[in-house]
């Protein structure tokens, strides 16, 4: 694919140089179209205009066609024209141009390319394959971008505020993982009655607040607790569930970005509101079914309160001091894992608040959700 596109661009430039850059019959010349970002209903594409050609560019932008199958085949390209779907963008001078195309269909493959038309005709750049992603009932799409992580007025371990950039978009669970979901996971993986795998306990069934038990043949959920968030799960048990789902626990930065409504950047103290009680259960005597409070700007529930949530990162109170700007993964080692969001038995905890527990901890106040990177 790369060889084809490089050859395509080279031939275009070679043709231009062969005919002469001042030739009145010269078409514009552009680089191959590249894909910068995509999601369920949009994509962002980019191309560079090298030459305007022998006359002014009168029409320009991007055009696209869809491909009905998601099977990847380098040779099965589609070449859109201005007779197909078009979104116009003024392209006048040699420069890098980026365009966002909205209104695409989820879970569909498109082929997109830039075009530029002058008096001599239309030049088309080499197309790029755009596989839009699915829309899920139980997951929320979080588009990649930048945000300011941490707090300038919080606790010491929330400082300093620093810019984080994600080079990937991701999906995150709309709700905290439930007892029913975790019970099904244990049974499908034929986990033993002690819920221990390779020496790591996944869930503490002996804790009286645990809503799962083993009846001698399989794991079962206690009556009325199916839709409550699963608790008494260790970090190992939470991460195992995430991996089975094709994902991971959220990194600390992914968690805070999603809680802050991603690119909407709501900037509220809690996940979707400046008032804790609108979006989260705090100072309560028991946990609650997910989705009973207001969601944040992305439609994610209970990132403030109900149960606190495991994150993937090791904890350090100095993690922010030398954190990488792009896709931070946290410290390489440690003794405790990050916990975020606060729990129903606590006073309100802001979305920048940080806590930590040993990964073997099976707390009645800690649950989790899943992140699937794109």
Predicted regions and their residues:
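Short, well-ordered junction/capping motifs at the entry into regular secondary structure
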Residues: 224, 276-304, 331, 355
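Hydrophobic core positions of the immunoglobulin-like beta-sandwich fold
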Residues: 101-102, 230, 290, 300
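Disulfide-stabilized, aromatic/cysteine-rich ligand-recognition loop
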Residues: 294-296, 331-374
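Short, surface-exposed linear motifs at loops/turns and structural transition points
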Residues: 21-135
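Conserved small/polar residues in nucleotide/adenosyl-binding loops
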Residues: 1-4
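Active-site microenvironments of metalloenzymes and redox enzymes
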Residues: 151, 165-272, 316-320, 373-374
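Cytochrome P450 core scaffold surrounding the K-helix E-X-X-R motif
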Residues: 149-158, 311-324
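Bacterial N-terminal signal peptides
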Residues: 8-16
